[in-house]
Amino acid sequence: MKSNAVTSVELELDWTAQTILPIEFRGRELQLEARAYQGADPNFQALVLVHREKHGAHEKPVVRVHSGCVTGDIFHSLRCDCYPQLQAAMNTITTSPLGILIYLPFQEGRGIGLVNKIRAYALQDQGYDTVDANVAIGAPIEARDYDLAAHILFDLGYPEIKLLTNNPAKVEALREEGVEVLEQLPLIVSPSHYNKRYLATKKERMAHKL
């Protein structure tokens, strides 16, 4: 399958394939470049979607590094803000001259995995906040790293980015990997009855810019 942007082909190195992915987003039909990457650990995989306009070749890309969330991204759980953040990020990415989504499905629950996330949710039902719940089940508060995301950005040829995130730790982690974050662009979403305490905890205890 061919397009003006890229040809579908099996690739060498540590990324496995690329193609054109047609999607429907908010009433628009878009054709995005899609690449699948494989990290050193076979469980560490990433899907990269690139939106580029003809005049965007020399722009600094707007980038979202998004941790996978089965409950939020797929089932639209109201307990977190993952789905509305992903939607807001995709809107910005697909209306920018050059935008990139790096989707990391292995980072479920800030890296603690799906089962531990549900265990932590059960404790939150008993009154724990998201930080204390992780501690109570013996899981890290934050278990993610961004070396694969940084590798992807360098592989794509974009060591300088504008990052869509509320999380200053993500900014610093990418900088430690050598990525120059020129600007942090917040993703502000409206809290719901179900996630307002979660968002307050992220702001007060994890320094998120909300």
Report each predicted region and the residues it spans.
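Catalytic domains of riboflavin
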Residues: 1-210
